[in-house]
Amino acid sequence: MKMKKLMMVALVSSTLALSGCGAMSTAIKKRNLEVKTQMSETIWLEPASERTVFLQIKNTSDKDMSGLQGKIADAVKAKGYQVVTSPDKAYYWIQANVLKADKMDLRESQGWLNRGYEGAAVGAALGAGITGYNSNSAGATLGVGLAAGLVGMAADAMVEDVNYTMITDVQIAERTKATVTTDNVAALRQGTSGAKIQTSTETGNQHKYQTRVVSNANKVNLKFEEAKPVLEDQLAKSIANIL
């Protein structure tokens, strides 16, 4: 009987250790804020002596980004460019729209998976298994095992690996001496089974380039209030570095 109790205590201790190790490992590895930014396409601009830029920054996400345009303007100025309020007086146009800024699985934004931990599941399974070693008090032992599993779940709940992603579409236009002809084609839906094709042609003096910027902020128990400024800084830096 004494041996069975010792075995039960040992298994419960192991359960608690297993349930907590995953959470502890995540807390240690993700204790510092990590920020990564990627661009879907490289934009090559022709070298020019003109250094005037017009900014048009939009935000259609559900997050407040009221200070983003100011950060982008500061980053552009730091590169030696002048930000102007009139598009007609600017050599470059930078247009950007924040599509989404929210919690997101890294597989969706970066294509790689941050493996999680399974402490709580192991704790519950091992706890139930203790019953086989104490047939005289199966109910009580099962209760101890389930309690150990719940402790593991509580430990896991306190440690969450959080990733915030900001997705931004960017269009940059640069003036050119050549005449640029642009053909626009749009498919407009008509009900559920049809579409109307709309085409137009225009001429101008700008080459336009498009890219998408994806920024990730990753940390244990990360809140958006902490992620927001670094995500904005990374976006501003990436846009300014195109010039």
UniProtKB/Swiss-Prot annotation:
What membrane topology does the annotation report for this chain? Lipid-anchor
Record keywords: Cell outer membrane, Conjugation, Lipoprotein, Membrane, Palmitate, Plasmid, Signal
Q: Name the lipidated positions (N-palmitoyl cysteine).
A: 21
Q: Its GO CC terms?
A: cell outer membrane
Q: List the subcellular locations.
A: Cell outer membrane
**Purpose:** Responsible for preventing unproductive conjugation between bacteria carrying like plasmids.
Matches recorded under NCBIfam families: PRK13731.1
Family the UniProt entry places it in: Belongs to the TraT lipoprotein family.
**The name this protein goes by in its record:** TraT complement resistance protein
Give the species this sequence originates from.
Escherichia coli
